[in-house]
């Protein structure tokens, strides 16, 4: 398996259309069993890997993540010496926005993914990367899902957007879902937002990766464009490269406002208009959005 940065590969596990054809058996990881009380029996090696992952990333995000994410981290109060248990996370999410996390296998289908979001349940694969894949991983693991995404689910506007997104996706056709996937990619996974005159990060695909966090916030290579829903829906992406473009919200309330619009009408218009020219070189057997 090629060594591609974690943050640009997570789409294989959730939102890449190509993944719909892949068997769960193709992943080398298997989610750990969850008890009737929602507890997972993590071992000491896994606790040690979690400690190294979270302590490293805490330093990277503290000046680069948006305030809503940092506030959410404070609410979650994730332990650094051990992996958190699902009920600990659910108590906070339920209190703040009515969400919960739902344990799932390493790879799930589009149908399952959208159904969970529509029910205010965020899918969390109950496995953690091995030490030899500390920085490179194909599937979205427990660290990516919990550290990358759960903090933002404490924010009402983000939570409302994600809920409506799930409802729309649950009813969408496969082609419509491919356009919706681009919306998710450039918001929930790789979204940026303006905050007091600075560009900050709220996308979990960025915030769970030190390399992508630095690249998205400081590199002069990628474009950073004002968020435009029609542009977003028509922008191709690849999961095996650092992103050539990010879309920047003026503020997080725009996510809620977007959730109140007729998003599917915008999807249909984007389908009629077609995709924009890609900002990356073609690749044989590429996995593109």
UniProtKB/Swiss-Prot annotation:
Obligatory cofactor(s): Fe(2+)
Molecular function GO terms recorded: iron ion binding; phenylalanine 4-monooxygenase activity
Keywords: Iron, Metal-binding, Monooxygenase, Oxidoreductase, Phenylalanine catabolism
GO annotation terms (biological process): L-phenylalanine catabolic process
Reactions catalysed, as given in the entry: (6R)-L-erythro-5,6,7,8-tetrahydrobiopterin + L-phenylalanine + O2 = (4aS,6R)-4a-hydroxy-L-erythro-5,6,7,8-tetrahydrobiopterin + L-tyrosine
Enzyme class: oxidoreductase
E.C. number(s) listed in UniProt: 1.14.16.1
Binding site for Fe cation: 144, 149, 189
Family: Belongs to the biopterin-dependent aromatic amino acid hydroxylase family.
The protein, known as: Phenylalanine-4-hydroxylase
Source species of the chain: Vibrio cholerae serotype O1 (strain ATCC 39315 / El Tor Inaba N16961)
